[in-house]
From Swiss-Prot:
The lineage of its organism: Eukaryota, Metazoa, Ecdysozoa, Nematoda, Chromadorea. PANTHER family: BOLA TRANSCRIPTION REGULATOR, BOLA-LIKE PROTEIN 1. InterPro entries: BolA, BolA-like_sf, BolA/IbaG_stress_morph_reg. One of its GO terms (cellular component) is mitochondrion. Residues 89-108 are annotated as: Disordered. This is Putative bolA-like protein K11H12.1. It comes from Caenorhabditis elegans. SUPFAM superfamilies: BolA-like (SSF82657). Belongs to the BolA/IbaG family. It comes from the Eukaryota.
Length: 108
């Protein structure tokens, strides 16, 4: 398990995801620095969760599980969440692809 960002929101997301899914692998990365937000903001995240809990579930079902787990944060502090929820049997150690460059914000 690894966490690429260690701010308080990233730590909370990591704790909640770990408790809910007992993942074989977990990455929580704050990508707010790629967006037009104040320095130090924790609003944009990507997560990679590899868990037996996702076995036999379609992608949309896996995403719903993650969204439900983080519902409070999504309703309050987290603006955007990129989810990579992988069943343990389908994970071969791959890392998430880099996120595309932000194209929005303040009329851009």
């Amino acid at each position: 398990m690894s966490t690429l960002s260690e701010g308080p929101v990233a730590r909370l997301l990591k704790e909640k995801l770990f408790a809910a899914f007992q993942p074989k692998h977990l990455e929580v990365e704050c990508e707010s620095h790629l967006h037009n937000v104040p320095k130090g903001a924790e609003k944009h995240f990507r997560v990679q969760v590899v868990s037996d809990e996702f076995e036999g579930k379609r992608v949309i079902e896996r995403h719903r599980l993650v969204n439900t787990c983080l519902a409070k944060e999504l309703a309050t502090t987290v603006h955007a969440l990129r989810i990579d929820a992988i069943p343990t049997s389908k994970w071969d150690g791959q890392k998430q692809e880099d996120s595309p460059t932000c194209r929005g914000g303040f009329g851009k």
